[in-house]
Amino acid sequence: FDGDGDLDVLVQGQVDLTPFVLLYIENQSMDLYGTADSLKYRLVNPCWGHVREYISQTGWTEFVCDTGRAANQRLRHGGTTLTSLDLNNDGIVDLLTGDSYNPYLRSLVNVMDNVDAEIDLTLSDTTFPVYNQPAILPNIPAAYIEDVDGDGINDMLVAPNQLTDGATSFFDTSITKEVDWYYRNTGSNLNPNFELESAGFFSGEMIDVGARSFPAMVDLNGDQLLDLVLGNEGYTIY
């Protein structure tokens, strides 16, 4: 994040029952040893972006950070995915987030700098990418930035990070079908424009009947050839 060559960490955390905040934890390897091969971390910004998240449909809100957290207070993760990238070609890291309570990706646009960040929610989308087909995936969706088609420009893959969302039946795996979305970047790495190419990037080339699927081979029609029967846990049989 600070451009010195070692890997820093941005993580969501919670202190006791307070709303979830973003914590910037800086790797001190280059500062202390002159190399990027060590993991020596220090909490630098306990409220990165000056935003917090309630576990409800209200999502992210802006706030003034209280930096007086006691060092021994326990941090808890909030079931949120974070993907860092520059969304608007200003050279500053922005975020894409996914949550356990919402099937959409959200963008958080940073208007300050990478370390002392300031998220402007008026520039942020609650259904990303709002200019194309928004990603709608249950169970903590996450964005993965990779050059999928080999053109030197990073594309976006979106997939869930949990099998069930708790609201539906644990055994209803129908919502796990076609949950690997591929967005091609028709813009650039610094100013991306993601357009949906496929809602089944991997599963479109497979027999997709959802999670916990099991095959059975049996001759169903007596032609002495094995047929394929597929079922998944508690949903249906094919």
Question: Where would I find each of the regions flagged by the language model?
Answer:
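Beta-propeller-forming repeat regions
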Residues: 1-238
